[in-house]
Regions:
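Glycine-rich phosphate-binding loop used to anchor ATP phosphates in small-molecule kinases
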Residues: 1-24, 29-31
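Conserved NTP phosphate-binding and transfer environment spanning the P-loop NTPase/kinase superfamily
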Residues: 20-140
Length: 140
């Protein structure tokens, strides 16, 4: 199993042959509740919370995709430390739509992929989910 990725991961480039193979391969979808995703991301991206000014400047990169009002709201949420609200809005209003569009256009088997749902993205929850996926994949 590999995670769906774009051609670039940070400053690294995924080799074309690997990317092409990934995009033609069978897919699975992991659907996590918004609450679980928010909690996971706040924990995983703690460095943004520790440096709100950096996050605020990063929000400016979205200026071609969202209104000035939306960006101002997100910056205010970051400035005031309203992390669950900010992360939830970024997921629902920005990331999710772009991600779905990218997956649908790049991964030929995405639409027909088996979905696995979870509301627990703790280490234990991810371990349980991984075991479910392996069992489901083994019996497929």
């Amino acid at each position: 199993f590999v995670e769906a990725e774009s051609r670039k991961i940070g400053s690294l480039h995924v080799p074309d042959v690997l990317l092409e193979t990934m995009r033609k391969s069978p897919c699975i979808k992991i659907e996590a509740s918004i609450e679980a995703r928010v909690e996971f991301l706040i924990s995983d991206y703690d460095y943004f919370i520790q440096d709100p000014q950096h996050l605020i400047s990063t929000i400016d990169y979205l200026k071609d995709l969202h209104s000035k009002e939306t960006l101002a709201r997100w910056k205010l949420l970051a400035q005031e430390g309203h992390w669950p609200t900010l992360v939830s809005e970024l997921l629902e209003q920005h990331y999710d739509a772009l991600y779905r569009r990218s997956q649908n256009s790049n991964y030929v088997n995405y639409e027909s992929a088996t979905s696995y749902n979870t509301a627990d993205l703790s280490a234990k929850g991810i371990d349980i989910l991984a075991k479910q996926i392996l069992m489901g994949h083994h019996h497929a």
